[in-house]
């Protein structure tokens, strides 16, 4: 069998029809699977010694979220090292990265595999992989025919990456430097909300504006901050992180602005604060809403005038710092309640970003699950970690109040449980490996604790226990926010919860 001119023309036409790179890539992969009559095909991008799926056909959806590190996938490493078509024999001892990931064929091993490395000049930029269940599935195609396919795919991928590079550098084609893959933090997700967020990150990254990142606990606000920094002109300088919720009031000012020797008991030497460390770079202030009003005033001055004073020093230091702030609270409500300065809010929220909760991201949950499965596979030295159809269905229908962080922990826990129930280095995650609660907390009246046959102390503790549970649920298990809601000190709340058996 050989390719006709019509077949090649059809592939080229499909590459031009798509609206946007993602659509073009998907059309290419779907067309290739039809033309080559294979069971699965994938277009992968090469970045930092790993292959990142861009488009798939015939494979489980979670493959799009996986990141295939070369050291963990010898077949993909062989493709990356090759300069030409790679055909793996049916009896190859090298494990196939897609074993168990072809829907309906989970228990079978892939038999035929062809890899086509894709180049832009001398640079490896990606690969095409073709898989089939029959050992001789690709024998009818010559290497020359497969090279033509690779050339078309390489051209499409190279153009897409070059456009991405030009857009990130805000350059015109005539000013382009030699092709170089753009390395940025991977934001996994193809849902409309995540697509819009990625566009907004691209827009604001090129500027020097302060950014306020809002979103529920566990949605990935720190990852957004990293993506902004890495795509900004400040990327060559440090990104400094500070969790404002973990700052004791007594040392908060020193952490932010530094101190001089002798400024207070224990200040045995001069020390730079986070603003100095982030000079010419970016400072990420996580949980900005936890700062006291006094510190908010000092932070505002830095944003206004660009100078800081170390604790115990009368001299001012000039700093050039871009501030990215994150919060899981509604700062507008905090301003109205008098807990957050309006002028600081407006300084920080020049360009606000909102990270969508996982329950609003549709199929992104499966992509993220695939990413975490691959992480577990590498960490535990397993040959494969795959999700059963029932497990995928369960993940798609659970609302994840803890968002991406809860999903990550659920996958890691499920892998450990699944591994304990079977021998070997292959793990299949079933629905029973996930211990998701059937229902959320009932309404207060249904959850009221009866006091019949209870003494006063028992009734009081039961009431305290239920009140703390409800406060935590309403504040997404943020202890500091729950303490404010209950009008108590967060340290006292932790101690009370421990005494009541609500935490270890």
UniProtKB/Swiss-Prot annotation:
DNA-binding region: 479-498
Pathway stated in the Swiss-Prot or TrEMBL entry: Nitrogen metabolism; nitric oxide reduction
Residues annotated for ATP binding in this entry: 215-222, 278-287
Keywords: ATP-binding, DNA-binding, Nucleotide-binding, Phosphoprotein, Transcription, Transcription regulation
Biological processes per GO annotation: phosphorelay signal transduction system
NCBIfam families: PRK05022.1
Protein name as catalogued: Anaerobic nitric oxide reductase transcription regulator NorR
Organism annotation: Escherichia coli (strain SMS-3-5 / SECEC)
